[in-house]
Amino acid sequence: MKRFGILIRGSIILLQIILFANSCLSQGYNHTWLLGYHPNVNNPFDTMAQIDFNISSFSIVNYQRKIPFRGFTQANISDANGNLLMSSNGAWIANSTGDTMMNRSFLGYDSYINANAQGLSLVYANTLIPYPADSSKYVLFHHSTEYDGFSYPVYSINYSVIDITKDGGLGAVDSVQKYVTAIQDTFNCGIAACRHANGRDWWVVAQKHDTDTIYKILFTTNGIASVTTQKLNVPKAWYNVSQLTFSPDGKKFVYQTYIPNQPDSSYILTFDFDRCSGLFTTHNPVFVNRGYIWGLAFSPNSQFVYACTTDKLYQLDLNTNNLDTIATYDGFNSPYTWCCPTTFFNCYLAANGKIYITCGNAIQHIHEINYPDSTGTACDFQQHAIPIDCYHRGSVPNHPNYYLGCDTTQTTCPCLITGFNDVKQHDFKFSISPNPNNGNFKIMYLLPQNSKGILEVFDINGKAIYKQNLPPWSTMQYISLPKLANGVYNCTITSNNEGMHKKLVVFKE
């Protein structure tokens, strides 16, 4: 009997190794976050860090690279296998090695950028998108700014095209299409991007300063096809610092605006978004009278918006418009007991379905929301949960949903080939964790566009013992089957006549 137990444990360990190896293959375009900068500018090789996400977890690697992220600006993109291709801190563009990209990648066309090569202190000041229908090219949209005597408004939205096939696969900035001015006006800080309903083109948006007007760029296979504006009929954005953010399903949009005549007050502004027409529809603004809203992020299921002030984290339920206080800063300092406060700043919905929150100070910890699809404190917010062993300020990647395809529920915009994420067979990115487990486990998955799914669990005889519907746009579920006996089961996800299965091992001491 003892020998049998050893055999079972050995089999489980072997299966864990196999499952881990498989999960490592579940990488993608938005699976990298670069952290750290050079605290000592005379030592350009200070240790930094990189977080690589798979669909259910992450790994942190500390290493040295040239490009720092001392400010609040970060754009990066990886290939389909999760290999980092390029990044930008708003001042310059780096290749996959972290060194300067070929062909004058420095974005130094104004004095502010020239003086901040370690990274711009502007939130969401750039973003990277794939060039429509051209898998060899990418487009970096980025800000330019100058001090106006009060703050740093943005004076243009620019873009640069990168050809990843140049310089032996390290990429190069296009010699003609670099620092191209898309729009010249006065803007607030922040750029957001969302895939068009046709599944190929992109919307890129930014706020006009001291107004309620939003600019919308439609970027197609021929470059900029149109630039339009829309009045949103909301409190005007005045020297705004906001994470302009689209929901994972592309149907909602959020930003915050500061109210200058009401100190420490903000509005959270939410909208419906039509990916075909580019039109925004305004919801009722949510007033927050307890501080300036810094960070914003949607939950994976697009139902909740998380918003944070310096010392408070809120959850806004878009189904009810109810604002709930999730947490208050607990007073923890990093990296020393006397410095520095790990307060709240920018939010980031990562590829593993969790939300991470940075701090505006130079600290060595980040916060984590483990279950952002859950209501209230069940979201499980853990302050300073993750040590990163390097100094990092507030920057998080400005990743649009690269996996958002054609909206097949509408007939106005025909589906077009993207050349970026078109596959004949759907990749469900299905994972189970922990595995083995005691009957309580988490599944992560990616359903086909606008489609619901079904989870089924079968015993070794092929008998279905559990079945659950999976809503469209959901990506994570917590399953509790405490009555399952020890053994090996088959878990299957199906949608649109396609499916994927994983082995589930139940083992109770």
Predicted segments — roles?
Residues 1-31, 292-294, 304-305, 420-423, ...:
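Bacterial Sec-dependent N-terminal signal peptides
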Residues 17, 67, 131, 150, ...:
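Sterically constrained small-residue positions within well-ordered secondary structures
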Residues 22, 155, 200, 264-266, ...:
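Residue-level signal for beta-strand positions within conserved beta-sheet cores that form or flank
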Residues 27-273, 277-420:
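Beta-propeller fold recognition
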Residues 425-433, 437-509:
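C-terminal outer-membrane/trafficking sorting elements
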